[in-house]
Amino acid sequence: MNGMEVFLKSVSSLNDETRILILRFLDKYGETCVCDMQESLDMIQSRLSRHLKILKDAGFLRVNRKGTWAYYSIRSPLDRFRTEALEEIRYLDVEIPELKQLSQTGECKI
């Protein structure tokens, strides 16, 4: 993939309110298990996974697998474009749901 394609993929990943919400959520809470995000964001697993993959492929997220669980976080370090995009996203008026930690209580079903 050339530089233009990478840039366009990154930009297009931000054209969805759900993905903006996911970025704000992970920016606030840090590394989070998919099951906790699913419960906190009230989203079915397949829809959440699709959005997480788009953000990961666009270079915004990293995944850390622990056994059968997948934990996502904002990739660090981000390049200048992604850092500035995340800074702008922080100023958007988006209600960030409370983190529900099913993975810590053993209630995670994923």
Residue ranges and their predicted role:
Residues 2-6, 28, 76-110:
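Amphipathic alpha-helical dimerization/coiled-coil segments
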Residues 5-46, 66, 70-78:
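N-terminal helix-turn-helix DNA-binding core of bacterial DNA-binding proteins
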Residues 63:
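Short beta-strand "wing" residues that participate in macromolecule-binding interfaces
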